[in-house]
């Protein structure tokens, strides 16, 4: 079985040689496999409502232990990419196969991002939402849509 590092190395070499022409099926399959076969997932939030939405959807995709981060991640809003920072914080303090983080995309007003990272912090998939001023949905509904979209971007249907 080909491992993620080999897939990444091959893609790097193709890019360096200017012969890369988009994603390959084996790359997509490896990402799907990592998500579906995850045994432990850490959700980078200590908000029970957000956690429940993500947990309920992910249990339809994989049979994993899904854990909520037990620290406050609001200080990530002080960084340039809060959602990604939350995921990396989770990676640094908990061992897992996948990390799911959701937060502001960038500058205040930029909207939000939900991102799924692997055990090395590589982005496997993500989705974006406009500012809440535009979409006007409650946070649980928005997170549900973001996670379903992030999964569908890599061919995992809910």
Swiss-Prot record:
Protein name as annotated: Uncharacterized protein MJ0488
Taxonomic superkingdom: Archaea
Natural source organism: Methanocaldococcus jannaschii (strain ATCC 43067 / DSM 2661 / JAL-1 / JCM 10045 / NBRC 100440)
InterPro entries with a match to the protein in the record: B12-dep_deHydtase_bsu (IPR010254), HcgB (IPR012019)
Pfam families: HcgB (PF11576)
Family annotation (Gene3D superfamilies): B12-dependent dehydatase associated subunit, Helix hairpin bin
């Amino acid at each position: 079985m080909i491992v993620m590092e080999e897939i990444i190395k091959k893609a790097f070499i193709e890019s360096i040689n200017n012969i890369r022409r988009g994603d390959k099926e084996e790359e997509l399959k490896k990402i799907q496999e990592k998500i579906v076969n995850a045994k432990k997932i850490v959700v980078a939030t200590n908000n029970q409502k957000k956690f429940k939405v993500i947990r309920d959807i992910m249990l339809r995709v994989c049979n994993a232990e899904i854990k909520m981060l037990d620290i406050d991640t609001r200080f990530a809003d002080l960084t340039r990419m809060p959602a990604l920072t939350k995921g990396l914080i989770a990676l640094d303090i908990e061992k897992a196969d996948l990390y799911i983080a959701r937060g502001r995309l960038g500058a205040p007003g930029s909207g939000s991002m939900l991102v799924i990272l692997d055990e090395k912090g590589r982005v496997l998939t993500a989705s974006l939402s406009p500012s809440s001023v535009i979409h006007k949905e409650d946070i649980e509904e928005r997170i549900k849509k973001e996670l379903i979209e992030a999964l569908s971007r890599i061919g995992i249907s809910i």
